[in-house]
C-alpha cells in the first residue's frame, strides 16, 4: 500500500498563543486521532507518532506560520487532509495550507533558516522610523542576528506602522541566532524612551535558504 507524507502550515493565534509547544503538539496529535487519520509510528520499544514540527515559538507569541510534516498509512491528498483535520481543530489553530511530499527533503528544524516577525507600533504621528532602525542595526547585541528589517505602512491607521524583521534561526557564517524574547524586551524599552507604543507582534512566516533565495517550507515541496 502506498503511504503518504504531507507538509502543512497552521496557526497559533489568539488565546492559543499562550499554549506551550508540547501542548500544541498534543492538540495536533489528538486532532489527527479524532479525524481517523492513520498516522504512522516510529519503531522500537516506545513508538511515537511520526509527526515533526518547526521551531517552537515563545509562549505568548502568536504565529500564522507554524509548520509540520506528518507520515500517514495509505494514500491521502493534502487538500483532503486539510479539510479533515480542520474539522477537529479550533479556528485559533487551523491548517491554512498543505502539500503532499513526493521527494526526500530535509527536516523542518534542520532546514528553516529565518523567521519573519511583525511589530505594530503607534508612533502618534512622530517620524521616528529612521532613528529606530539606526538604533537596532547599531546594537551589538542584535545587529548580527537580524537578516533584514524595514518599516512598512499599516492598514490600521495613519499613526500605526509595522516593523518587518527577519531574524536568523541558525548559524550560517558570522551571524548569531535571533532571540525573540530578548529583542522584544529591548524594543519595548526603546519604544518607551521615545514615548511610542508597541501595539502588537506576531510571527508572520518562516523561510528556507535555497540558492540565495528565501523560500517558505511549502515553496520547496
Predicted segments, located by residue:
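Ordered, soluble secondary-structure elements with a strong preference for glycine-centered loop motifs
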Residues: 18-22, 75, 79-80, 126, ...
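Extended, well-folded interaction surfaces typified by the phenylalanyl-tRNA synthetase beta subunit core
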Residues: 3-4, 9-11, 15, 34
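Short, charge-patterned binding micro-sites
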Residues: 40-72
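Ordered, amphipathic secondary-structure segments that act as subunit-interaction surfaces
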Residues: 64-118
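Short, low-order "capping/linker" segments at domain edges
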Residues: 105-123, 207-221
Amino acid at each position: 500500500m502506498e503511504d503518504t507524507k504531507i507538509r502543512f502550515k497552521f496557526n497559533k493565534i489568539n488565546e492559543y498563543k499562550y499554549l506551550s509547544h508540547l501542548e500544541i503538539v498534543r492538540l495536533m496529535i489528538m486532532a489527527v486521532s479524532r479525524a481517523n487519520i492513520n498516522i504512522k509510528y516510529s519503531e522500537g520499544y516506545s513508538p511515537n507518532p511520526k509527526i515533526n514540527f518547526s521551531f517552537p515559538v515563545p509562549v505568548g507569541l502568536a504565529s500564522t506560520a507554524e509548520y509540520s510534516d506528518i507520515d500517514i498509512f495509505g494514500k491521502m491528498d493534502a487538500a483532503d487532509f486539510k479539510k479533515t483535520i480542520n474539522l477537529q481543530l479550533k479556528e485559533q489553530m487551523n491548517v491554512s495550507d498543505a502539500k503532499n511530499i513526493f521527494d526526500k527533503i530535509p527536516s523542518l528544524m534542520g532546514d528553516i533558516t529565518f523567521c519573519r516577525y511583525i511589530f505594530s507600533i503607534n508612533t502618534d504621528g512622530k517620524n521616528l522610523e529612521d532613528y529606530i532602525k539606526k538604533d537596532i542595526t547599531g546594537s551589538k547585541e542584535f545587529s548580527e542576528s537580524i537578516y533584514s528589517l524595514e518599516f512598512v505602512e499599516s492598514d490600521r491607521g495613519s499613526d500605526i506602522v509595522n516593523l518587518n524583521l527577519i531574524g536568523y534561526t541558525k548559524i550560517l557564517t558570522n551571524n548569531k541566532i535571533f532571540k525573540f524574547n530578548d529583542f522584544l524586551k529591548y524594543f519595548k524599552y526603546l519604544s518607551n524612551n521615545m514615548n511610542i507604543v508597541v501595539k502588537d507582534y506576531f510571527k508572520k512566516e518562516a523561510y528556507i535558504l535555497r540558492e540565495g533565495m528565501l523560500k517558505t517550507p511549502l515553496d520547496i515541496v
